[in-house]
Amino acid sequence: MKDIKGATSEEIRMIRAIQRSVGALDNGWIGNQTLSDIAAKLGADCFPLNVELYGQPCILARDIDPVNMSGPLPKDAISGGFSWQGQPCSILVRGGKVVRDWSCHYPRPESVLYKTKDGAVRIARVSSAAALGDVVWAVGGLGLLDRYDPAAEGFSGVYSDVLRKTNHTVLGCKGGLLYGVYCKAMTAQQVNALCRDKLKLEYAVMLDGGHVAAINGACSKLNTQTRQFYAVRFL
């Protein structure tokens, strides 16, 4: 959709106040970001929702299902975390069962977005899934926002390649919603800035990128036929 700006200073002031109250970027423009934040606040029945936010295809939903798989990307999904030789190599818990126990660069820890049994979504930097306790799901990746420190998580030297300018996917959360973001042709620093300054996410991890980065939404379908070993479905 085309963003709309208030015609008077008072209309802009009203829009910015609404944006601040729902956690959107208070820029005075009404677009998908503001409307999706309002929808989340009102409990609107429109999720999972596939929209573009600041030019980046996104899927928003109340919950996710991280899938260890082998094949094309399923519907309402983004490509998942780091994998090696056909298996996830970042921490992965699905349905309360540990699929991958160790961090990508064990013993160095990694940032993990996870959901507790009481429904809370949290983030922690750990080396093993066991350190999270009893969780519903957990997805490991490169920490973003205030946890952005690639070297601390082992993404340095030969492993710094994941920071390069390419397509990346992100899993984040804000205001009770999970965000799957397909970031087009960005460095890791640019991905971090998008999540922090525009999307205003509370927690976020960057997942795998390059040739495997993909999104399969109702409208956004990018690289959907590439064989995936790890995906995040939005429910």
Language model: regions and residue ranges:
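Conserved, well-ordered active-site substructure
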Residues: 88-107, 161-173, 177-206, 212-235
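Beta-strand-turn-beta hairpins that frame and shape the catalytic cleft
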Residues: 53, 118-121, 173-179
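Active-site-adjacent helix-turn-beta-strand microarchitecture at beta-sheet edges
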Residues: 86-155
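Zymogen propeptides
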Residues: 39-106, 180-181
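Short, surface-exposed charged micro-motifs
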Residues: 50, 112, 170
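Short hydrophobic-aromatic micro-motifs
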Residues: 59-60, 76-78, 113, 121-123, ...
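Active-site neighborhood of phospho(di)ester-bond hydrolases with catalytic His/Asp-centered motifs
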Residues: 77-80, 204-208
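Short acidic, glycine/serine/threonine-rich helix-capping segments at coil-helix boundaries
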Residues: 1-16, 20-42
